[in-house]
Regions:
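Divalent cation-coordinating acidic motifs and surrounding scaffolds
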Residues: 1-219
């Protein structure tokens, strides 16, 4: 059985070279003291994988080592990435971290239980040569008194998948990323309550000068 750290087969190596060239043309390079590249990616059902270079029709899941190499190559172009739909099984995530290398860090939530939560986590991957954790990590919860207020498109319960806020530091700058995975629902209007709630939450945070930091960026889908 092949492992993610093994040399890939020739066809995959060739494809990875094409991918690198394409990424070079589309994503700006990392520059010391000049930029910080932040991304968000919903990697659908990012959990288990088949430990073959290329999965076949009978294999489950279809995600294979070839896929992980491609995912890791894309992730490596950024400094911090918020990832949604990380599952309870983190085999694919572990292999991705092996490809990225020892200078990459990871912080993630526990699994959201219940049918609506879909057994998902949220995670941040970050290049420790470029950014470090600032010390803040929290899940955002709406105060009970706000839940009891009835209004148009108001949130009447907690988030199905709790938004995850983590602070990062680069040189003398600190910023807080908030990743969320909004309840999709059957209609667009079903998404409004959670979107409005997170907007109000971040607005209140940014206005309070005594809070940990006011540089806030919301990510996700």
């Amino acid at each position: 059985m092949p492992h993610i750290t093994d040399r890939p087969i020739k066809s995959i190596s060739k494809e990875l070279e094409f991918l690198k060239q394409d990424l070079d043309s589309k994503i700006p390079p990392k520059k010391l003291d000049r930029n910080i590249l932040i991304a968000t990616w919903n990697i659908r059902a990012f959990g288990n994988l088949t430990r073959k270079w290329i999965s076949r029709g009978e294999d489950s899941p279809k995600r294979d080592l070839h896929s992980i190499l491609c995912i890791a190559e894309i992730l490596s172009r950024f400094d911090v990435i918020a990832i949604q739909e990380v599952k309870s099984n983190i085999r694919a995530l572990r292999d991705t971290m092996k490809v990225l290398g020892n200078h990459w860090g990871l912080i993630l939530t526990d699994v959201t239980r219940g049918s609506a939560g879909n057994g998902e986590r949220m995670a941040y991957l970050f290049d420790t040569r470029r950014v470090q954790l600032s010390g803040l990590a929290c899940e955002l919860v709406v105060p009970k008194e706000k839940l009891t207020k009835i209004g148009v498109d108001a949130l009447q319960e907690q988030f199905v998948r709790t938004p995850y806020a983590v602070g990062f530091r680069s040189k003398n700058q600190t910023f807080i990323l908030v990743t969320l995975h909004i309840k999709y629902g059957k209609k667009a209007k079903e998404r409004k309550p959670e979107l409005k709630a997170i907007a109000h939450w971040l607005s209140d945070w940014a206005k309070n000068i005594s809070e940990y930091n006011q540089n806030l960026i919301a990510l996700g889908d």
